[in-house]
């Protein structure tokens, strides 16, 4: 994605922003899930919620973005969108 501004903007617009505006812990849940090796149980412990809550939130991520964090290739896209979105947010501030 180096040098591809359109791809970066698309990830921010279609993936990162919808997750942020959902404001029900989706970014936090997705970030924890990805950083904890895609473990539902570890994510639940980290966030002090039930594993079913993590499952529900990850389904909401799929519903909002069209990308399923339970599938490795799609999880990579989501992880990239989180990184690009955070960089874009910090660049604006």
Task: Enumerate the language-model features and the residues they cover.
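Cytosolic nucleotide-utilizing catalytic cores of signal-transduction proteins
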Residues: 1-93
